[in-house]
Amino acid sequence: MKEKISQFGTNRNKGFSMTFENGFAISVQWGTENYCARRFEKKDPRELRFWRSSTAEIAVLNKKDEFIKINNGSDGVVSGWLSTDTVAEVIVIVSSTKIQKEIEKKSLTLSSY
């Protein structure tokens, strides 16, 4: 029986990651050090029961845990200030794609980048 590699992860009450059966992963973060609406917040998300933000940043990783270029920004690997709808669109792309170049190409077409 093939071992499943899909999993969820959490990060300091300010984000999560998802690794999909295809081996690709996405990190979604909305904390004080991330490119999001709460970037300059003085509160520590770990001390609060709930932590919300109107925007988030994402990064996508390949099967070797290396960052994939997903935008035209300066570093190209982290994309910030994204709405929930845009994050959901990227999750669909990452979870349903078989090759890295397809993720790179499709993510560049999203309007919020």
Task: Walk through the language-model features, giving the residues of each.
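Catalytic phosphate/metal-binding cores of nucleic-acid and nucleotide-processing enzymes, i.e., regions
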Residues: 1-113
